[in-house]
Amino acid sequence: SNTMFLIGTYDKETMQFTRECVQCVDYGLDFYAPQTMQTEDDRRILIAWMQSWDSNIRPEGQKWSGMMILPRELKVKDGKILQSPVREIENYHRNGVRYEKQEVQGTCRFDGIKGRVLDMTVEIAGGDFREFTISVAQNEQFHTDFSILQHKNRIEIDRTYSGMVRDANAIRRVKEKSPCKKWKLRIILDKYSMEVFLNDGQQVFSTTFYTSLEADQISFVCDGKAIVNLEKYDIVVA
């Protein structure tokens, strides 16, 4: 996405806007045409099409094209815009699973942490590692990855092995401007999409993938040692 937030001050008398901060709205592979609205309780909500013209517009065998992102609440804090899933999503939380202070070395899975329609928060509270990856929509053949590469100060989202058309855009690499030792990722996983809200919505990554729904495993991969807290809810719409 090339859509940007411009934060600053506006002088009504001179009709001049003074730019103070510029930030990307979404760093993922599929994000287009965002719009905002204001709710009755004065929240600013953003919605957009989760699709890119560089991606496969219409999945083979399907009668739909792209999808909408989950509506996001926008807030300004310390001169920057933070994004978070609308709070109403919590009304659809079911089957909560929690783990605290779990050690991740190599490849790990946790009982109850799987699925294709869910809301999961991962806190990396400590440890010593160069790379940490969360693989979703996974089976023996397919997976989509979100990676923190601390030694390169870089974030990556990679759907190369999701079963997508090979010539489509598959990897997005983003420089982490404020490297840190503690990370918080909130991942909204839908049947054919993933939205990652990094560090309370300082950065957001949206991507589609068209992996078979039978691929529902989630793995955590660390090249050193990481201490993580996990909280996961299925999203169930009656």
Region spans (language model):
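Beta-rich accessory regions
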Residues: 12, 19-238
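Active-site neighborhood of glycoside hydrolase catalytic domains
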Residues: 1-21
